[in-house]
């Protein structure tokens, strides 16, 4: 069958539409089967496990292409949820033969074995109904195969069996939380812990290197390079604390609220049982949501988590910028740090090496900040009993988690771990700074100290020479007071 004919059978539209739709398929199918939903029959590629509603969504939401597909963690979370739902539903009367087949099929989804059968994009209904039905249809057809039946026969029904006691309105917010909590625990927290540990190690390594401080990008009083890196380490530690503190709200699951939060079409105790099953399956402390109406109508937990990621991005932006500026040069910049040389930096300037890890990280931070805007707008658009920005909230949040996790790991491995101090340059800049004059304040007063600094700057002489010329100090007094190593903390 030609691509044109195949696509016509799928879309039923114009030649242009049909050809455009054909190009969106991951692979061109040459055979089809008939699937049905309440709208009637539709042709589905024979080699795909999805059914009628997924096929209609493919045709109705051709937005963004491959890069806009529903995030894989959401798909895997659907596998976890549907497996747990079947397990609990068997306690409430679901045929064990069907239930066990659903559990086996759902496990394959959770393991990522059926990812190619989840083609839908984020840009669909705001409740995520199409993706919920995608999961229901794939699991139903795979369960049918496990039972020795054919796809599309509906001996395992996507709604009656796989989606039993569920609504898209509670399943999608549930998988949002499962996916986010899982990714944060498995990816983000380990990456940030490693980055924090390495920054802390550098702080100790550099603890005795006294350097000039800078405020307003201008010279200030001294500190140690270790103190500077200690500030970075603490920022990351606080970021870890912030995101960890959001997890208790993510651990609350909406499942059991069904359509509007009342729990219609579920049995008493279903919500508690399924949360416990998910907790056991993921080894994370999931519980049923305290209030299902809040869990469906709002996504404040996701906004809160995204806010913590936004703060982490803010911290990492500052850290990466400081490090690349301190490493600027090699001859005409600040040059206090020597950054690892990972790759050639210019296609025209031979020998140039750039702070690429810092640049990559700062771009990631910008993206995370943008994602937080999307999550904030999405979270603010919960109308009455249902928020209908769920897919974009989930996508943006998971994108931020993955980006920060990966970028932090890359930054730690390819930059921070290999940073060295340029001791000679640091010492030179330290002893050229006019701000060492601050240590004279207690002895000669602010006004006299300012006069010393201005004279030294105007005449191009040293602070000591200026102080002696003004007659405010003896040489011995100056040498006793202006000791950078004694200016890095409170006096006794």
Swiss-Prot record:
One of its GO terms (molecular function) is fumarate hydratase activity. It is an enzyme of class 4 (lyase). Pathway: Carbohydrate metabolism; tricarboxylic acid cycle; (S)-malate from fumarate: step 1/1. Fumarate hydratase activity (fumarate to L-malate) is strongly inhibited by phosphoenolpyruvate, citrate, oxaloacetate, ATP and ADP. Malate dehydratase activity (malate to fumarate) is activated by oxaloacetate, pyruvate, Asn and Gln. Malate dehydratase activity (malate to fumarate) is inhibited by citrate, succinate, ADP, ATP, glucose-6P and phosphoenolpyruvate. It is found in: Mitochondrion. Its EC number is 4.2.1.2. It catalyses: (S)-malate = fumarate + H2O. The active site is at 216 (proton donor/acceptor), 346. Keywords: Lyase, Mitochondrion, Transit peptide, Tricarboxylic acid cycle. One of its GO terms (cellular component) is mitochondrion. Substrate binds at residues 127-129, 157-160, 167-169, 215, 347, 352-354. Pfam families: FumaraseC_C (PF10415), Lyase_1 (PF00206). Residues 1-28 form a transit peptide. It comes from the Eukaryota. GO terms for biological process: fumarate metabolic process; malate metabolic process; pollen tube development; protein tetramerization; tricarboxylic acid cycle. There are 2 substrate-binding sites: the catalytic A site, and the non-catalytic B site that may play a role in the transfer of substrate or product between the active site and the solvent. Alternatively, the B site may bind allosteric effectors. Homotetramer. This is Fumarate hydratase 1, mitochondrial. The gene is FUM1.
